[in-house]
Amino acid sequence: MAEETLLTDDFLRQLMNIGEVDIVVGLSTHNNAKTIGPVVAAIQAGILKCFPRERAAIINVDGGSQDGTAELVTQASIDDLWRASKVYALRTLHSISVRYARTPDPSLALRMIFAAADLLRAKACVLIAPDSTTIDPDWLQRLVKPIYTDNFDLVCPIYHRQKFEGALMRNLLYPMTRSIYGSRIREPYATDFAASGRVATDFLGNGISELDWGRMGPEISVTIMAVTGKYRVCQALVGAKAHASRNSQDMVAVMRRTVGALFSSLDSNFAVWSAISGSEAIPIVGTEIAVAPENARVNRKRMLEMFATGVAELEPVLRSILSASVLAELQRIASLGIEEFEYPAELWTKTVFEFAASYHQSIINRDHIIQAMVPLYRGRSLTFLTENRDGPEENIEMRDESLCADFERLKPYLLEIWAERK
């Protein structure tokens, strides 16, 4: 059994009362009372509808919620679903909750869920974000079925996003992960995914979670482990993805968890990614699900202002991170008006690669490097919004592919500057 120390006596007792299962659905929560009820109901309905013969358990690991989240998970009644759907499970659906800390620790939470799946000998372990407000019961089937029927080890989602959603994924996480690790996974940092029992067990035993990038970005670390370890990976079309509104715009924290984890992963995986050229398609299962378009209102002038202010105020920091030519070009476009402004794809790609190399070399404090990247990302996001505001979604896909091609084409530039000292 992997990582026995993750299982407290109380947690272990609850798991032993369940016995072996086929499917574990993990929920890592922290003050999610406003959304957790519908999420649990959708999970229960998905198990009833799609896996009535399978033994299943919902396992909630809670990071110190003060709003009754854990109680809502364990008290969720499946009786109402039985009566409404007229579909009955042929096995008991278990639901347990354990508090692991007073503050959230996503890396520890993931390891605890995987340790539970390992102990229960689950064939599939599904992770669902507790604030996924658009989840429907069919998500379970779309994520789990490829593991059951086609022996895949990791199923990553492909979300149908509104036009201007997922800018960080489209402009940085996807193209860079694709160019670095050579796999076209559209959502490398997904909070909803399914892993085989093999992946869960191996993740616990390979020490990734003890590395900086494993602690910062546990979800993307599972993806990277899978693509570098030659596990069988596919992608499932799950439909729309939306989160409950957040106090969100702490973009520094978001980028630290995502971009910081990706940059950090390059250190320990250099021998792997430095030998990769181009990228390979990853199988996609399921059918596209239509989603009604929504009009998003964005303050473009404010975005330009944040970009220009960041370039000006952070000049000494940027000078230590970026080449003189890239910094000069950023200063030039920062002086442009809203109608003339453009942050070209090639300039953005070089910017990202120079930040990655400086992060590797720890030119300055790594957190400060990520913070300095935030206003530049806002500038690139402004160009993304401007380019796509009037066109159809097909144009966005074409531009996404073009940006990925730039990242792949310029990867030798990253290798060239990787070991240089500024």
Feature roles, as predicted:
Residues 1-45, 402, 412, 419-422:
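N-proximal low-complexity "stem/linker" segments adjacent to membrane-targeting elements
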Residues 22-24, 57, 221:
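Cell-envelope/extracellular polymer assembly enzymes that use nucleotide-activated donors
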Residues 62-71:
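A conserved acidic beta->alpha catalytic loop
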Residues 75-120:
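Active-site-proximal specificity loops/subdomain of glycosyltransferases
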Residues 105, 165-264:
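Conserved catalytic loops of nucleotide-sugar-dependent glycosyltransferases that act on lipid-linked
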Residues 113, 117, 121-133:
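Short beta-strand-to-loop acidic/aromatic patch adjacent to the donor-nucleotide binding site
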Residues 135-158:
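Conserved donor-nucleotide/metal-binding helix-loop-beta segment in metal-dependent transferases, i.e.
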Residues 259-422:
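Terminal low-complexity segments of carbohydrate-biosynthetic enzymes
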